[in-house]
């Protein structure tokens, strides 16, 4: 899957079956995915979020997907609120949540069937989290990359308001650390570059050995993202 990541230049991150399997395992438990899951998918399946984060875990569990060709906030709300569909799961980047909460049908939409809502791909504004929380929907926040297939870090819904702005903790089978410019691990509270490793990490970039070499320190993927432990 091609991604520009933090460099701005698209690179083909190689995605193998092991990565996808461990991504399913890593996400299934915190997202409460089961055979009863009905998930509305609004991201395109050529995107790692649409395919690997949102669709594959549900397919693996034997749940049900509802796909829409183009995102429309009114249509998405009508599906979420339709008792015939009983949508239990919805995941998206922050923008769709904002478009839906600004839609005139938002306040009147019945969201009682929605048990799990997830957001990632970009920092989520506090106003979005609080607006949806006021409707009884607490969001699972997370961090990931195409290179991490994409699940890497997750914040449980019960901590959404207590830890506003946090990406959470490493998911199953992943390990993270924060390092300085010399690659030395930093103490808690100091900002540095996030490194991550695990069986869900890409082996490298397609036909781009230079990018692969520059992106790894041993088996640690250098994400290029700033982070700190609290």
Language-model-detected regions and their locations in the chain:
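Conserved ATP-binding/catalytic segment of the ANL
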Residues: 169, 184-189, 193-230
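Conserved G/P- and acidic residue-centered "switch" motifs that form tight phosphate/ATP-binding loops
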Residues: 5-6, 62, 121, 144, ...
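Conserved AMP-binding/adenylation subdomain of ANL enzymes
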Residues: 21-38, 46-88, 98-99, 103
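Phosphate-coordination loops involved in phosphoryl transfer and adenosine-cofactor binding
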Residues: 35-36, 113-114, 218
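Conserved AMP-binding A3 loop
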Residues: 1-22
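Short beta-strand->loop structural element characteristic of the AMP-binding/adenylate-forming
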Residues: 11-14, 41-42, 63-70, 140
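Gly/Ser/Thr-rich phosphate-binding loop
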Residues: 31, 87-92, 101-162, 175, ...
């Amino acid at each position: 899957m091609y991604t520009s990541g933090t460099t701005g230049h698209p690179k083909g991150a190689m995605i193998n079956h092991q990565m996808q399997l461990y991504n399913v395992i890593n996400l299934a438990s915190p997202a409460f995915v089961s055979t009863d899951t009905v998930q509305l998918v609004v991201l395109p399946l050529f995107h790692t979020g649409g395919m690997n984060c949102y669709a594959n875990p549900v397919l693996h569990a034997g749940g049900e997907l509802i796909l829409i060709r183009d995102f429309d906030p009114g249509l998405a709300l009508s599906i979420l609120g339709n008792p015939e569909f009983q949508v239990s799961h919805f995941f998206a980047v922050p923008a769709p949540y904002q478009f839906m909460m600004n839609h005139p049908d938002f306040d009147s939409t019945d969201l009682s069937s929605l048990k799990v809502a997830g957001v990632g791909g970009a920092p989520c504004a506090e106003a979005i989290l609080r607006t949806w929380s006021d409707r009884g929907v607490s969001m699972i926040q997370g961090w990931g990359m195409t290179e991490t297939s994409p699940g890497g870090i997750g914040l449980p819904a019960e901590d959404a308001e207590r830890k506003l702005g946090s990406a959470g903790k490493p998911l199953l089978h992943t390990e993270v650390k924060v390092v300085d410019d010399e690659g030395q691990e930093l103490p808690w509270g100091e900002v540095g570059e996030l490194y991550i490793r695990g069986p869900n990490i890409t082996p490298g970039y397609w036909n781009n050995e230079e990018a692969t070499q520059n992106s790894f320190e041993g088996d640690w993927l250098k994400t290029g993202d700033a982070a700190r432990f609290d």
